[in-house]
Regions:
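Conserved alpha/beta-hydrolase catalytic His-Asp/Glu region
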Residues: 162-226
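The conserved beta1-alpha1 loop
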Residues: 40-42, 108, 236
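A short loop-to-beta-strand scaffold at the N-terminal edge of the catalytic core in hydrolase folds
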Residues: 21-31
């Protein structure tokens, strides 16, 4: 299958994989060998967000980075509503179709609810968790509610996202602390997946869902105690907006009792852009803690997991 848009190969030098999903296609990256790490993005990002993490770790473990339907290079099936519930179903389908075993879930932004929905329903298949600037409960703090009402509201929020591509054009650069990293290539990579107003709707549904998906988020929250004994690395960008204050990080520390935490004073919301090196280190660490140590050339051996790849 052909890419729907071009991306700088020096930035994103990966082979494309495609998983049929209903009458759509899920695009994903599948790099490396060894213990399986699933990298989940948020809004309005895609697997490109993890490019520098994948480059650093591809010789040490197997990294799977999907694009949700309607994001990145994935094609949404007919009737797809772009809700987090549907994205969670798509991620579950991908994990099951690829037969991924004993996975590490790496989650940030909406990747938290999407990925942890899988984790709370399949805790025995989750080896570890790396968690960055996210939540998995109904929004109660005022900044998040106001953000949802503005960015996911009608008509202003809808106009901003569908007519101005506001999330990709403005919020992503604003959520990166190191401004020298906000290059023309990066801007292009995040705006190109949304060339028309109709294709930008997914970026509006996500902020709208902060309020609209309350019951679904509450169901995840009720099951979070199932994750208490899973080793976790919490990586928190302290320069993030008021929606992800330190108090939210501390809440995660109380839930994920087997956590190790690193608070980053030089990272904002998109930790993967600001500090991909620390994301990679956190993945290595959780693998070490779970006896699935990342492969180091000529020093560490591992037992390959039972899984398969699909290419079209």
């Amino acid at each position: 299958m052909q890419r729907p848009f071009e991306v700088d190969n020096s930035e994103y030098p990966f082979q494309d994989h495609w998983l049929p999903y209903r009458d759509g296609m899920i695009h994903y990256i599948d790099e490396g060998e060894g213990p399986v790490v699933v990298l989940l993005h948020g809004n309005p990002t895609w697997s490109y967000l993890y490019r520098n993490v994948i480059k650093e770790l591809s010789g040490q473990c197997r990294l799977i980075a999907p694009d949700y339907p309607g994001f990145g290079m994935s094609k949404a099936p007919t009737g797809y509503g772009y809700t987090p519930q549907e994205h969670a179903e798509a991620v579950t389908a991908l994990i099951e179709q690829l037969d991924l075993q004993h996975v590490v879930l790496v989650v940030q932004d909406w990747g938290g609810p999407v990925g942890l929905h899988y984790a709370v329903h399949h805790p025995d298949n989750v080896r570890g968790i790396v968690l960055m600037n996210t939540w998995a409960w109904p929004a109660k703090i005022l900044p998040m509610k106001l953000f949802s009402m503005t960015m996911g509201g009608w008509p202003l929020g809808y106009w901003l996202q569908t007519r101005r591509n506001f999330f990709a054009h403005t919020i992503v650069p604003g959520g990166i602390h190191h401004k020298e990293k906000v290059t023309a290539a990066l801007r292009k990579a995040y705006t190109d997946p949304f060339p028309t107003p109709a294709l930008r709707k997914p970026t509006w549904v996500f902020p709208r869902s902060i309020r609209k998906a309350g019951p679904w988020l509450a169901e995840i929250e009720s099951r979070l105690p199932l994750l208490a004994e899973i080793p976790a690395q919490i990586l928190w960008g302290l320069k993030d907006s008021a929606g992800f204050p330190v108090e939210e990080m501390q809440r995660w520390q109380g839930i994920l009792r087997m956590h190790e935490t690193e608070a980053l004073s030089d990272a904002s919301h998109y930790v993967q852009e600001d500090r991909p090196d620390r994301v990679a280190t956190s993945i290595r660490r959780v693998l070490e803690r779970t006896n699935g140590a990342a492969k180091r050339p000529n020093t560490i051996k591992f037992t390959e997991t039972k899984s398969r790849r699909i290419s079209i």
